[in-house]
């Protein structure tokens, strides 16, 4: 299974501001959807909650939300408590490519642990 990171980065290397995207570009959002469609996506809880409620969970994708909060529940999502646990779950489901979609702490952990096989950067 390929473990991919997908991120939109500003010229100053910023990936977000106050738990939101820096910009909302239709073509970038379309690209994100096309690339991640029908795959497992892994996101941190804060990043997930920053997605407008009407778009949650992201459709036609298996949404895996990472949280330390053992009582956290979100309808339509798989809740995991570690990045390894989330990746293992996707692998057990015979996923071919899992996407780490943020936020910053999740990206940092995946990169520090040398887990990333492929990066999609816009």
Where are the regions a protein language model picked out?
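Extreme N-terminal starter segment of soluble prokaryotic enzymes
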Residues: 1-5
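Short beta-strand/turn micro-motifs composed of small residues
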Residues: 7-9, 43, 67, 102
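Zinc-dependent deaminase
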Residues: 9-10, 26
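Short gly/ser/thr-rich secondary-structure transition/capping motifs
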Residues: 21-26, 101-102
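C-terminal boundary of histidine-terminating zinc-finger modules
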Residues: 13
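Short, surface-exposed acidic-centric catalytic microdomains
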Residues: 22, 31, 36-81
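A glycine-rich beta-strand to alpha-helix segment
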Residues: 50, 72-74, 78-122
């Amino acid at each position: 299974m390929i473990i991919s990171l997908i991120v939109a980065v500003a010229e100053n290397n910023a990936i977000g501001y106050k738990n939101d995207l820096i910009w909302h570009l239709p073509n970038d959002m379309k690209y994100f959807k096309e690339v991640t469609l029908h795959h497992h996506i892994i996101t941190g809880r804060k990043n997930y909650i920053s997605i407008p409620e009407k778009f949650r969970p992201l459709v036609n994708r298996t949404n895996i939300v990472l949280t330390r909060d053992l009582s956290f529940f979100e309808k339509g999502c798989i809740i995991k408590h570690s990045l390894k646990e989330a990746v293992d779950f996707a692998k057990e489901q015979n996923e071919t490519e899992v996407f780490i979609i943020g936020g910053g702490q999740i990206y940092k952990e995946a990169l520090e642990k040398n887990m990333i096989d492929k990066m999609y950067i816009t």
